[in-house]
């Protein structure tokens, strides 16, 4: 009889524990909150070329601290803007955006990428390494190009279109080279993801055809030219997916496409938009195929328009992407850089509206903002909105590629509001979190470093209330979470 009662109590206890946990769609607890940091043309970092090592580091720490104050938990850092590198590479020269001349290393030498990753992870934030797959020379009239740049070594791989030079996406050797670059990054650095933006085939220049006819004639594979171009992009994405996950299975692969996949007037699967150029028809990036085939782990469509826009309405597009994520992680790209550009973007409610809208949809897991410098002057008071309302509590990043199950933490009271915490096993641990439930709403009350052994709730800013419930969880390196343990 005692055994039966004990079993019943254990079952009831497990049921209550299960009910206590928020769903994975609870945006107050689980949410990606990222910022793009562009290095091309020194948009965000470093502020200008030729800064001292100390100034480069100081600027980066300042922007990280600003984003952390705003509640961000990830950065998307551009490390390969134009066939170059913001890190030491045997494959590509140092970027001109660092020291002012392509091929010129910092002096005295240091590795900016290793530094940036360390500082980012120190703050509990993810580091997504953003690379441009096809742009090779940003401006053929002005850009510094080193003798060791790949355009000098293999000029036959490149075409000029407008004032830029591009890797020719139709040449298999280009795919192979890009895979070598990515494998080098993934194998040498503790990044959390490889990230690519919307620049596949370039946006069309009116009256000019992209000059890839020779490559098409040489290797058309029986396809018409438009399908051949899409096939080229499909091939490199499929290969990169394999390269990344074979090198380090836990590293994510994400794409941030232009906001319109295809207009409904061209395809019944498309959005009710009037995009002048689209991913599928102009950039030859079939994002839906990549999601459907599982070739990418997350997608961040750039929805840089306001709600109510007459050609590309934010509401229409955010709903469309919510319905076309194919089970992959979906975050929304916000055009915070547009603050003040028209009446809609002078409205302080625009970004709050966009956040509320995406949080109301089940398949959207967060936001990414373009770009870092836009936050410097608190546009429309949006820094305040994030700090005081939308991101007032920290959030746990979504678990995209978990490689192991996280062990349940152990917690014991040592006196007052002081506790000893830890885990019994040796699984890689990223952090602990205190989850609270207040008036039916879950939130993350505090994130705690993985090496913490003793915590004090008052010191963490967690003021316990009798009407609330509190739990401790352990978070793994890939953001997987343990069972919830009630805090006594």
PLM segments and residue spans:
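Aromatic-lined carbohydrate-binding/catalytic grooves of carbohydrate-active enzymes
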Residues: 70-107
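Polysaccharide-binding and catalytic clefts of secreted carbohydrate-active enzymes
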Residues: 72-73, 80, 123, 152-295, ...
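The substrate-binding groove and active-site-proximal loops of carbohydrate-active enzymes
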Residues: 43-54, 94-110, 161-176, 221-234, ...
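Catalytic domains of carbohydrate-active enzymes, especially glycoside hydrolases
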Residues: 58-84, 188-191
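Substrate-binding cleft of secreted/luminal carbohydrate-active enzymes
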Residues: 284-310, 326-401
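Active-site-adjacent "subsite" loops/lids of carbohydrate-active enzymes
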Residues: 30, 38, 42-58, 129, ...
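Active-site clefts of carbohydrate-active enzymes
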Residues: 38-39, 252-275, 303, 317-351
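Extracellular fibronectin type III
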Residues: 477-488
């Amino acid at each position: 009889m005692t055994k039966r009662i004990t079993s019943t109590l254990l079952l009831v206890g497990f049921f209550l524990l299960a009910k206590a946990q928020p769903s994975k769609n609870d945006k107050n607890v689980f949410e990606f909150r990222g910022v793009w940091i562009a290095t091309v043309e020194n948009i965000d970092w470093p502020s200008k070329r030729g800064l001292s090592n100390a100034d480069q580091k100081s600027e980066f720490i300042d922007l990280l601290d600003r984003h952390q104050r705003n509640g961000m938990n990830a950065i998307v850092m551009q490390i390969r803007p134009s066939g170059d590198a913001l890190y030491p590479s045997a494959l590509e020269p140092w970027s001109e955006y660092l020291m002012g001349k392509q091929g010129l290393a910092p002096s005295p030498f240091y590795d900016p990428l290793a530094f940036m990753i360390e500082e980012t992870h120190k703050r509990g934030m993810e580091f997504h390494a953003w690379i441009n797959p096809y742009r090779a020379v940003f401006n053929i009239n002005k850009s510094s190009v080193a003798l060791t740049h790949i355009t000098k070594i293999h000029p036959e791989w490149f075409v000029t279109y407008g004032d830029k030079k591009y890797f020719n996406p139709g040449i298999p050797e280009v795919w192979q080279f890009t895979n070598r670059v990515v494998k080098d990054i993934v194998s040498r650095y503790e990044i959390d993801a490889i990230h690519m933006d919307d620049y596949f085939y370039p946006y069309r220049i009116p009256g000019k055809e992209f000059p890839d006819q020779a490559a098409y004639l040489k290797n058309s594979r029986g396809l018409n030219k438009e399908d051949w171009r899409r096939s080229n992009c499909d091939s490199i994405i499929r290969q990169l997916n394999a390269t990344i996950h074979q090198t380090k299975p836990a590293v994510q692969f994400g794409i941030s496409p232009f906001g319109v996949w295809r207009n409904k007037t061209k395809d019944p699967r498309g959005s009710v938009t009037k995009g002048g150029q689209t991913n599928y028809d102009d950039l030859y990036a079939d994002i839906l195929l990549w999601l459907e085939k599982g070739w990418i782990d997350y997608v961040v469509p750039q929805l840089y328009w306001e709600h109510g826009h007459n050609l590309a309405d934010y509401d229409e597009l955010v709903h469309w992407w919510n319905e076309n994520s194919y089970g992959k992680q979906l975050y929304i790209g916000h055009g915070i850089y547009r603050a003040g550009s028209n009446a809609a973007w002078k409205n302080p409610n625009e970004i709050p509206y966009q956040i509320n809208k995406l949080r109301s949809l089940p398949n959207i897991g967060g936001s990414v903002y373009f770009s870092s410098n836009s936050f410097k002057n608190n546009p429309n008071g949006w820094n305040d909105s994030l700090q005081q309302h939308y991101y007032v509590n920290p959030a746990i990043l979504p678990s995209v590629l978990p490689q192991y199950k996280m062990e349940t933490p152990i917690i014991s009271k040592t006196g007052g509001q002081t506790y000893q915490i830890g885990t019994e096993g040796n699984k890689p641990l990223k952090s602990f979190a205190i989850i609270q439930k207040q008036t039916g709403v879950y939130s993350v009350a505090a994130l705690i470093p993985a090496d913490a052994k003793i915590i004090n709730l008052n010191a963490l800013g967690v003021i316990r209330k009798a009407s609330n419930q509190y739990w401790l969880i352990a978070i793994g390196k890939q953001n997987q979470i343990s069972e919830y343990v009630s805090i006594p």
